[in-house]
């Protein structure tokens, strides 16, 4: 009996971004390796998104539209999409996590990543995820460590494949460890999931050639100094979720000591150090950071702070 080739199942989460969804679907239509199946998860239950999905049905051999009753955030949307997808998938298939505002660049990228995934699965049967790039986790500081430019060749072992990096997740691994953790709502979704896969004994890899090309195109080569800045930028809702989720993740992985360090230094120390130079902004950070720290320590998860109504990237 001849086994069928692994299929590609895409999951695309969106919230009030019809123009970007159209661009992303158009890009998927132009891919040399078309998706076998695409599940669009609409957190806004927007008829315009459903209409766009019908218009770009050629983006995949089979396209499905899931309307959510409420905004579950990116993470909750991916969780819903993964749960829906595994029901009709084989263990050897891949689930490709897509972004609604960052279409795949180049018509060959899905084909290249599929080939890379097959190669890594042959070399390392515990391969659970491949993608363009990602990062490694510093458990001592509770921070992401940037992979140096000099490492960007061949297969790069990672702790997680980043957002907007076209993560290919093996269905067998998704079934074993579960989908994304929707409690996070937004922020550090891929980090938590990658760490969960690593804890289960799985491997994750970045594609050095694609990653180097992506950094070069973005003008981000020769930027290996990832030391944190002492200055505060204007507070946005995303910062709340990043801090809350970091504390939650550290506690969930039995690193409460690092969670305390993050709380004291990142949550309170940095805003206090900026009180003189930027009092209004520092006070906003202090107020929202205190809330994020409280929620991260008490497991108050989900959508606890409302996102901005309009994204800066919306047209």
Show which residues each predicted segment covers.
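Non-catalytic, C-terminal membrane-associated alpha-helical segments of glycosyltransferases
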Residues: 251-315
């Amino acid at each position: 009996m001849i086994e069928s080739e692994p299929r590609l199942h895409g999951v695309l989460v969106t919230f009030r971004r019809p123009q970007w969804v159209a661009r992303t679907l158009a890009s998927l239509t132009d891919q040399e390796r078309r998706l076998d199946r695409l599940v669009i998860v609409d957190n806004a239950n927007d008829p315009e998104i459903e209409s766009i999905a019908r218009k770009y049905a050629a983006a995949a051999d089979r396209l499905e539209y899931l309307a959510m009753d409420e905004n579950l955030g990116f993470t909750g949307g991916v969780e819903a999409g993964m749960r829906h997808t595994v029901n009709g998938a084989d263990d050897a298939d891949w689930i490709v996590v897509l972004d609604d505002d960052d279409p795949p660049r180049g018509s060959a990228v899905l084909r290249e990543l599929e080939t890379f995934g097959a190669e890594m699965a042959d070399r390392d049967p515990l391969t659970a995820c491949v993608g363009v790039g990602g990062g490694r986790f510093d458990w001592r500081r509770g921070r992401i460590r940037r992979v140096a430019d000099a490492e960007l060749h061949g297969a790069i072992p990672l702790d997680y494949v980043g957002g907007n990096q076209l993560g290919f997740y093996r269905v067998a691994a998704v079934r074993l460890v579960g989908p994304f953790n929707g409690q996070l709502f937004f922020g550090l979704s891929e980090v938590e999931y990658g760490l969960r896969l690593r804890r289960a004994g799985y491997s994750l890899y970045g594609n050095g050639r694609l990653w180097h090309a992506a950094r070069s195109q973005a003008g981000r080569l020769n930027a290996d100094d990832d030391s944190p800045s002492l200055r505060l930028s204007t507070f946005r809702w995303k910062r709340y979720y990043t801090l809350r989720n970091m504390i939650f993740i550290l506690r969930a992985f039995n690193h409460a000591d690092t969670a305390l360090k993050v709380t004291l230094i990142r949550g309170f120390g940095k805003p206090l150090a900026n009180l003189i130079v930027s009092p209004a902004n520092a006070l906003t950070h202090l107020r929202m950071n205190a809330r994020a720290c409280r929620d991260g320590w008490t497991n108050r998860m989900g959508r606890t702070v409302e996102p901005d109504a309009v994204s800066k990237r919306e047209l």
